[in-house]
Amino acid sequence: MYGKMKEFLTKELAGIKEAGLYKNERIITTPQKADIKVNAGEEVLNFCANNYLGLSNNQRLIQAAKDAMDSHGFGMSSVRFICGTQDLHKQLEAAISDYFKTEDTILYAACFDANGGLFEPLLTDEDAIISDALNHASIIDGVRLCKAKRYRYANADMADLERCLQEAQAQRHRIIATDGVFSMDG
């Protein structure tokens, strides 16, 4: 069984390579920043990282992470709601809430997780979510995971958005989901 599958996958991979669609992994050998070295020391500009604020190599944050590892160890060892919430999480969430003058804050390990988990607890099948067609995959996944009736409008097309709003008029709540920076179409 495995022999046939391996043979099939080998042919598929060869076809992908022949079509010029094979993606070689770039190995970054420097800290994440705007200019990085990859593979055998090739210097390139990094336009694809999620390091939007340049915080991944901020020395104060690196030192804070080292201090946290010294006092709390490495990693949460579980998801937050089982036994992964530590006092450091609650302290940071309180500081963020205080800074933004909000009632509470919930930290997620990644924005993908935050977007994926946003809509489901807020919306029911009585509601509507109206999503821009070029939203990030994480927003699209979050929309798919919720029970709300789903509508999609053409990217930044206000007339199409208005059409969706009219179609969803009978729903209890109508929420528009749009990206801050549309990154999914290059």
Please place each PLM-identified region on the residue numbering:
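General beta-strand structural signal in soluble alpha/beta enzymes
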Residues: N46, D104-A109, S131-D132, R152, ...
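Short, structured coil segments at secondary-structure junctions
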Residues: D125, L145-K147
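Short acidic loop-to-helix transition motifs that present clustered carboxylates
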Residues: F112-A114, H136, A156-D160
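Active-site phosphate-binding strand-loop segment of PLP-dependent enzymes
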Residues: N51, Y151, N155-G186
